[in-house]
Structures are given as C-alpha cells and as structure tokens.
Amino acid sequence: MEALEVDDISPALEVTEDFFSTFDSKLEKAVQQAEVYGIQEVPELVGHEVLGNIADNGALRSVASLGKGTMIWDHCKSRLLETKAQNVFPAKEQLMVQRGTAPDNLSWMAQKEASTFNFFNICQRRRDRPRSVNDLLDETTTFKPGHARSRSDVTHVDWRVVLSTMPLQQQQQQQQASLQGIHFPGPSFLLSSPSKVEDAQGNTEHKQTFPNILKKGYLEIRKNHDSYWQSCYAELSPYNLNFYSLDSSGNQNLYATYQLSHFQSISVLGNLEARMVDTVLYDNSQLQLKAESPWEALDWGQKLWEVVHAAVPNYMGRQGEMANSPGLIHHGDCAQNHCLQKKSSGLLASPVLDSPKQYQNILKSGTLYRLTVQNNWKAFTFVLSKAYLMAFHPGKLDEDPLLSYNVDVCLAVQIDNLDGCDSCFQVIFPQDVLRLRAETRQRAQEWMEALKTAANAARSSEQNLQVTLRNKPKDQLDGRELRKNKRQSVTTSFLSILTTLSLERGLTAQSFKCAGCQRSIGLSNGKAKVCNYSGWYYCSSCHVDDSFLIPARIVHNWDTSKYKVSKQAKEFLEYVYEEPLIDIQQENPMLYLHAEPLATVVRLRQRLKSLRAYLFSCRAAVAEDLRRRIFPREYLLQQIHLYSLADLQQVIEGKLAPFLGKVIKFATAHVYSCSLCSQKGFICEICNNGEILYPFEDISTSRCESCGAVFHSECKEKSVPCPRCVRRELQKKQKSFWRQLNVDESLEEACAMFELSYQST
C-alpha cells in the first residue's frame, strides 16, 4: 500500500484541530487552569463531573463496575467507596510529569496533548480501566511493592447485563436492612446471555476460554487451626470447588470436591495484610484457604461468595431474615474483617436432611470431640433432632450413625470441670455418660441449651401423648416401636465399642441404676454385675453370667478366652456374629507378627485374591463355581484383612485355613489347565529367563506393591529397583529433562541410558 502524502490528509487535521480548540475553550470557561513552570494542570472537575453524571443517570450499578473483569462490593462504607472512585482515573501528579517533559516549541499536536488528554481518558476509560480488584488497587498511592497481579481470572462479564442493572443509589435504599459489612452483588457470569455479545470496543467475536471454570489458581488449604497447610491447585466451577494435589512431576490429581450448596459462611479474615479465606460448611466443619497475596485472597472470597450466592435460589428472598439472625457475626470495621454469612436454612438440601424419619427435624449439627475409653478426644459429627442425638464419622453423614441416644431419656446436661476446660460438658443418659468438648465455650453453651431444650420438649410431648391416649389399651401405645427404638439405641452403642477394650466407670456414672432395666442396684438394692464387653453394670435379671468371646480382647491381645457378658451384649454379639466388621490391618496390624494362625490365614487369603482375578476373567461358569464354594463370605476373596467374629473363632479353632486351602487347590488347578488363564502369566524382568510366573505362587515369586509386576523371589531380594516402575517414571519426565541430557526424543534411547545394574541369573 502506498504511503499518503501530507497534502492528502491536511483537511482532516484542520477539522480535528478546530474540534479540540472548541473543547479546550469550554474547559477554560469552566475552570481557570493554573500554569506551574510551564506545566498545565489537569482540571479535577472533568473526572468527578463525568463520574457524577454516570452515577446520576444510573448507567452503572456501582463504582466498581468501571472495572472490566471483576465486581467489587457495593454495600460498604462511604470512605472506602470514595477511595475507589478517586482511583478510577490516573493520578493527577502522574499526568503532570508526563506532560512536563514536552517543550513549549513543539508542533501543534504536541501543544494540544495536555488539553486533549482528559477527553481521551474519559472516552477510552473502558480500555484503560482496571480488569479486577487487584488492578484497581495497583493505581493507588498506598500500593505496596511486590504485589503480583492475579492471572487466574477467566470470568467474562456480559456488559449489557451490567449496564442495565439498577444504579447504586437505588440498590442501597432497598438494602438498608442488610448486613453491615461488605456485600457482593449477584454474579452476572451465571446469567443467560445471547450467543453474540458486543463488548466495550464493539467486538462481537468474544469467546470464553474456560466456560465452566470461573476461577482457578494455586492455593494452600487446611481444615482447621490444628492441621497443616497443604499446597494444591483449585478450580471454581458454578456448582463445585475442586482441589487437585500436585505430585513431584507437577501432575494434578483430584484431591477433594466441595459442593457450593454446603457452604454456610464465607469470611475474609484480618485486615489489608490478610491472606486467608475462612469458610464454614453445613456440619460446622471449617475449610481455610490461603492465597499468595492479600488481594488474591480477597478476590477468591468474592468469587466464591458470588457463586454460592447464585447456587442457592432462595437466598435472595431471605436477606431480610438473615440480617436479624442471631447466628451471624457482626464486625465493626468492614475494611478489616470482610465477613459474609449465609443462613443455613436457605441452602439447598444437605445430606443430613436426605435421610429417613429419624434424621428429619434437625435442631443442631456440628463437630464435637468425645472422650473415649483410651482417654483421648476423638472428633465426631453430632446431629441433634427432636427425638435423637446421633454421632457420625466426620464427613460420612450418609452412613449409619455410630452412636444414637433417645433425647427423652436424657437425665442431665452439665458442665464438665474435670479437665479444667471451659468448653467441656457432660450429657448423662441411663446407659452411658457422654463427655463432650466443643471448640469454644460459646459453642459448648449453645449445644447445652439445645440439648436441654430438645429433652424438655421430648418429655413434654410424651406426657401430652400419654394424657391424650389415657383411655386406650397399653398395646396401642406403640410399645413395639418404643422397644425397637431402644434396641436400636443399644445396638449402635455396642457397635461403637466393638473393638474397644472396656473399662469399668463405676456405679456413680450410672447413678446406681441398671443399664438394662433402670432398676436401682448397688449397696442394699442388689448386687451389681459388670459386663466384660461394655463395662456397664447390670442387675441379676439382666446379667445371668452368659459367656462369649470379646472381639476387642482378640484384636488387641489375642485373648481367645470367653468372658461373662450381659443379656444385651450377648444378644448383640450373636446378631453381628457373622458380619465382617473387624479390620485387623486398621485396628492392630502388628497382630500378624504375634499370632501365627492369623498370619497363615492372611497369606492364604492373599493367594485366593490373586486367583480370583484369573477365575473372574474366565468363563462365567468358572466364576460362578468359585463364588458358590466361598458363599456367603465373598469378602474373603476381596478384602483380605476383614474378619467376622465367626472367622476369628474358626482361626482360633484351626478350621479356616483348611477351608481356604481347598478353595485354593480348586482355583490353582483350573489356572494351570485352562488355555485362557494359563496364558496370563508374567516374565521376570530382572533375569529374563523366560519362565512363566503367577502371582499366587507366593513361595517362589515376589510381587511389586506399586505396579503389580511379578519377579523371582531370589531376584527381588537383591534390592534391585523394579524395572517397570523405573520405566514408568522415565516416561513421565518432561522434554526439558531430556534436552538437558542431550538425548533425542526417542523413548527407547532415553530409557537405555538408565540401565539397571544387577548380576545375571
């Protein structure tokens, strides 16, 4: 393309000069400009006048909407709002320095630069405005060096939606009853928008890079103040918050996923130097996030609150109710503590509410620490309903409760001062005394009040029910249901101490009453008999000296003797006699070293597990034959450390090992004779002698625990690293690793550099 001559564009320059001259003359009439050493000062009226017009016309929802990529809170103090408004335009001193470098004898274009700069600054504010909260604060004079701009923002805002929202003044009038803190507007990125959206520059070919990821970046997380910080990679989607762990090679593996509907509160703690986002889930468990910089943490808190806000449809209608809620945390200074609370009743249905009838009417739920018989505190998730107090494993509310107590039989709720801790309290039931500890004294008081209220309400409702049904026969008072509930409570209590050694607590802990029938025992009321399974005391009617194996004594001491237990304990042990509830590897893995019969059984079960992989991949008739021989104890094939009380008794009597030997003999004969299974062997990669090896030949072979490769036992004993594991590690290396070694990209040549040193066998 040929260059244009000067004469061809001079008319356009003359018209432009006349236009800017008219604009400058209007500014001179409005404000008298001061001349300081030949530098023209920019009038401050232009920026504030334009900003005021925009706010009065309702063109923008908030001052922060001048930023392109992120929205700021619109319900904060006027002092913070004014600071943001002043920093929307560049500082006056910076413009003076830039224009001061130009001499007075430049061409007419340079002479007009000072007067026209404000015009371009206003007209092009969409190009020059900051892209997020971090960029907005980059231009303030109080900015600290070393701050790194976050590049994890991938949100694209539909500006036609933003510009059409109500102005800031109207929104503040409608939200006078809202929280005194920092409040985020509704997220515009979750709204529906046309397929082609015109941005600030008129570009309609705008495409989202990550449509399902609202924010991502590297964070450090921990679950409470006692745990350690763990580095991970986080991704925020419209419904989940995903965390990925990083291995030594930089690969990302999914570590944990949190549903946004389970978040109860989101807080950005501390002042401007804070780097932590504190969240509370529906079960009162904590999740803390720490970013690389304070403003990055602030941005994470904003994005997280916006998405949680949009994930809960009923939340907008509950803002007035939330402002008067006593459970919210109010802070005096919103610039130092940015706390955002969300009422739990406005959340979507959590797993606690998706349960049977006994899980409904939840009054309170949270994490409490229970004092076990080993004199240590163990965390449980307690759920208090109108009828029951239940304890679950943390994060496993969909499973059956470990403990379950009827609230109507609660005897007392009192403070526990034995340990000198003000957050400990006791909940006394006829069959047990719960010693619990909360995280703070306030939470302990809340739990005590909730328990007392629930117990009084349950007793009063039961009394009213008895008065109403006074003339009815006793068999119509749901006696069967009451006995069923009592039996279920006893069963769950006994199940929680299945592998726990019992300790005698004394008759004082039971208020000198029988744990079975509540009859007075001790002293002159009758002899008290102790149950060796639970450690509770019973009367002569509830304890008739029945003998039974104690699972905890077998697991921890390999004590195979029978001890006297109560009727309730015997009924429970007979009920779970054939249930695989005891995991030796989890409870006491050292037992295999001291109990030779148990070590023999676990070796046979390991062989049977290896044979199962062969037979279950063969014909269906063969797999069915193996399943029939082992029925109904198929867990013997899959989980080699899981036992029932009947299995342990057979181990003691020496009957389980011969039974497993017969099944192994049948499966081994099939593998050797089957044309399909016999071809699924291994070759020792250390000696490479061509002999076919099978993993169930545990005497002559050894198997790698990482990759599952099979070698000769003699070859593996030479402490040679597994060739397959080494090969897999080399395949994970990046190309930069091989370039540093001056090796071609060929994998065979690269792996040949790391030959293993071993003697030929």
From Swiss-Prot:
An individual GO BP term: myoblast differentiation
Coiled-coil segments on the chain, per record: none
Keyword line: Cell membrane, Cytoplasm, Golgi apparatus, Membrane, Metal-binding, Phosphoprotein, Repeat, Zinc, Zinc-finger
Classification via PROSITE patterns: PH_DOMAIN (PS50003)
Chain positions found as Phosphoserine: S132
Cellular localisation: Cytoplasm; Golgi apparatus; Cell membrane
Main location: cytoplasm
Entry-linked CDD domains: PH_PLEKHM3_1
Keyword Zinc recorded: yes
Zn finger region (Phorbol-ester/DAG-type): 669-722
MF (Gene Ontology): zinc ion binding
SUPFAM superfamilies registered for this protein in UniProt: PH domain-like
Function summary: Involved in skeletal muscle differentiation. May act as a scaffold protein for AKT1 during muscle differentiation.
Binding partners and assembly: Interacts with AKT1.
Name of the protein in question: Pleckstrin homology domain-containing family M member 3
Organism (species): Mus musculus (Mouse)
Phylogenetic classification of the source organism: Eukaryota, Metazoa, Chordata, Craniata, Vertebrata
